Design a protein with these regions (language model features):
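Flexible, surface-exposed loop regions and adjacent strand-edge segments
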Residues: 59-66, 130-140, 193-199, 238-246
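Predominantly the C-terminal beta-signal and adjacent terminal strand-loop region
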Residues: 214-267
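Outer-membrane beta-barrel transmembrane domain signature
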Residues: 151-154, 165-222, 228-238
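Extracellular loop and loop/strand-boundary signature of outer-membrane beta-barrel proteins
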Residues: 29-31, 85-90, 144-150, 192-198, ...
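Residues on the lipid-exposed face of transmembrane beta-strands in outer-membrane beta-barrel proteins
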Residues: 44-48, 98-106, 118-120, 155-165, ...
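Short glycine/proline- and aromatic-enriched beta-strand/turn motifs that initiate or cap beta-hairpins
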Residues: 23-96, 267
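Outer-membrane beta-barrel channels and translocator barrels
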Residues: 37, 107-111, 168-172, 215-219, ...
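Residues that define the transmembrane beta-barrel architecture of outer-membrane proteins
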Residues: 38-42, 94-98, 153-157, 173, ...
Length: 267
């Protein structure tokens, strides 16, 4: 984890702690004492997110299935790569994003709830790649250009579902942990990144979160930090050769998505 990411996570946790203190530090009476006994309730949420990739590069770029299926690409690739075979790319920086959605909460038992929280997340990822290209070929054909930093925006339709385990309520505060899964469809990547790298639009995620419910006079306010771990390799090695990936895009073996979100619920 680089220093920029560490600072971001520290700031996020500080915001989480501050929101909990702001909404839960005063108590005169117990609010909403029967709130958790409702079999079904609704709400909405707002959040801040950051997205990144877990990047796996080919040890030898010519192991990419595209070159196996289309060997006619290899001669130009060798010129472009200056006859080198190994390159690297890494996640570069933190770019903040925004999340919004709704809540459908089903009470299962005293301590367990089933949560359905569909929404939308807007964000971007940025990575840096290290490749010594043949500059004589730069911009000679479509898609062949020199890039060092690459940003890929995303507009996700989020479909998460999970189980929340609630701890003991202490006055107007109640901690919880969340375990779940999510399916996400990216509405943005095809339009923006098709000329850069071929990505799948859909992917599955495992999710874990923790937070604190604050029972106010008229509603329940909740702050939660959640980590979404992408299970799908988003790279499409079988992309249509009629829309070839720029040569620097062939170095990626796997791109897996991570999303870190600070969420504020109003229920």
């Amino acid at each position: 984890m680089n220093l920029v990411k560490l600072k971001y996570y520290i700031i996020t946790i500080a915001l989480f702690a501050g929101s909990v203190q702001a909404f839960g530090q005063r108590r005169s009476v117990d609010n909403l004492t029967y709130f958790d006994e409702r079999p079904l309730h609704f709400g909405f949420y707002l959040g801040l997110n950051t997205m990144d990739y877990r990047i796996t590069n080919f040890n030898n770029v010519y192991d990419n299935p595209v070159f196996t299926a289309h060997p006619e690409l290899i001669p130009n690739a060798k010129k472009y790569y200056n006859n080198k075979t190994s390159f690297a790319a890494e996640d570069y920086t933190i770019l903040p994003g925004f999340t919004v959605g709704g809540v459908v909460n089903f009470r299962l038992t005293r301590d367990f709830d089933l949560r359905f929280t569909p929404g939308m997340s807007l964000g971007s990822r940025s990575f840096k790649y290290f490749i010594d290209i043949n500059k004589e070929l730069v911009n000679q054909s479509s898609g062949m250009d020199e890039k060092t930093y690459l940003t890929t925006p995303s507009a996700y339709v989020d479909i998460p579902v999970g189980i929340r385990y609630k701890g003991f309520r202490h006055y107007n505060l109640r901690p919880f942990v969340y375990l779940g899964a999510a399916y996400r469809m990216d509405l943005e990547n095809k339009r923006i990144t098709e000329s850069v790298v071929h990505l799948k639009k859909n992917g599955g995620y495992a999710e874990v979160g923790l937070g604190l419910d604050s029972y106010l006079e008229y509603f329940r306010f909740t702050a939660e930090v959640r980590f979404s771990y992408g299970l799908s390799n988003l790279i499409r090695h079988d992309a249509d050769i009629a829309k070839p990936t720029p040569y620097y895009g062939y170095i990626f073996k796997e791109l897996n998505s991570n999303i870190f979100t600070l969420i504020f619920y109003f229920e």
